[in-house]
Curated annotation (Swiss-Prot):
Function of the molecule: Catalyzes the decarboxylation of oxaloacetate into pyruvate. Seems to play a role in maintaining cellular concentrations of bicarbonate and pyruvate.
EC annotation from Swiss-Prot or TrEMBL: 4.1.1.112
Full protein name: Oxaloacetate decarboxylase
UniProt cofactor(s): Mg(2+)
GO biological process: oxaloacetate metabolic process; propionate catabolic process, 2-methylcitrate cycle; pyruvate biosynthetic process
Catalytic activity: oxaloacetate + H(+) = pyruvate + CO2
Subunit text: Homotetramer; dimer of dimers.
Cofactor remark: Binds 1 Mg(2+) ion per subunit.
Family as reported in the entry's similarity comment: Belongs to the isocitrate lyase/PEP mutase superfamily. Oxaloacetate decarboxylase family.
Leader peptide range in chain numbering: none
């Protein structure tokens, strides 16, 4: 089957945003997973930054992967995908000028959309790992992203962590990003539907929600009614692949089955505890 053009896939994603439905993403992390997701009927996929870090570096989600490494993985997926893919571009790999470079490279890679977040990344000395950059800086990044885009069909999505802010500050951020001209808002840290309603009320553009499977946010019809068009429940397919690989290799070595789950395996083999210790020792990063 022929692979659609990058522009066609971007228009497909635009159609999702313009619809009245809510779509759940497939976690795609390599060309094979992208093909499987399309064959199973998923309408949209996402290449997560955390998943790319695990897949490319076997490292945790500490903003360690470089733009070039992330773009290489996105390009591999882009060569074969038959569904639009959102790239989780983290903080844009630096300041507003770095964001412009990120947009250029990911557009060439063929992604249909990308998110730029306002988290203070990489983690800074003495800060919490969840701290956000100043609002003015965040707006500058979004404006830079829009300026760097060549194909207007590629969607630029502003991402912020509503769980780290009070409602007033969160609304101020999303409204500022909407005013900057982004195509959608991605919210992380939404607690429940009451919280979502307060954040969505002043917005006129579509929403993307990262829920990590939050049971308080499972009603797809209600999500759609509030303007949520894309939901990321997590990256279960990738973690299932880790678990399947581990169990298969243990069996080949005639080692008894393990009780470790996929999350525990990812923690062990990404050496997450070491990275956390280094961040505390060398950077005084707060959890």
């Amino acid at each position: 089957m022929a692979t659609p053009s990058q522009h066609d896939l971007r228009n497909d994603f635009r159609a999702l945003l313009a619809s009245s439905e809510c779509y759940f993403t497939a976690s795609v992390f390599d060309p094979m997973s992208a093909r499987i997701a399309a064959d199973l009927g998923f309408e949209v996929g996402i290449l997560g930054g955390s998943v790319a870090s695990l897949q490319v570096l076997a490292a945790p989600d500490f903003a360690l992967i470089t733009l070039s490494e992330f773009v290489e993985q996105a390009t591999r997926i882009g060569r074969v995908t038959r569904l639009p893919v959102i790239a989780d571009a983290d903080h844009g790999y630096g300041n507003a000028l770095n964001v412009m470079r990120t947009i250029t490279e990911l557009e060439r890679a063929g992604v249909a959309a990308l998110t730029i977040e306002d988290t203070l990344l990489p983690a800074q000395y003495g800060h919490k790992s969840t701290d956000l950059i100043p609002l003015d800086e965040g707006v500058g990044k979004m404006r830079a992203a829009l300026e760097a885009r060549i194909d207007p069909a590629m969607a630029i999505i502003a991402r912020t962590n509503a769980g780290q802010l009070d409602d007033e500050a969160a609304v101020e951020r999303v409204c500022a990003y909407q005013a900057a001209g982004v195509d959608a808002i991605c919210l992380v840290g939404v607690r429940d539907f009451d919280h979502l309603e307060r954040l969505a009320a002043p917005l006129d553009i579509p929403l993307m929600l990262v829920t990590y499977g939050n049971p308080e946010l499972r009603d797809r019809a209600r999500l759609a009614a509030l303007g949520v068009r894309v939901v990321v429940n997590g990256h279960a397919a990738y973690f299932a692949a880790i678990k399947a690989t581990y169990d298969c290799l243990r069996e080949q070595r005639d080692i008894a089955a393990s009780e470790l789950n996929a999350s525990q395996l990812a923690t062990r083999y990404s050496t997450l505890d070491e990275y956390r210790e280094w961040a505390r020792d060398y950077m005084d990063v707060k959890e």
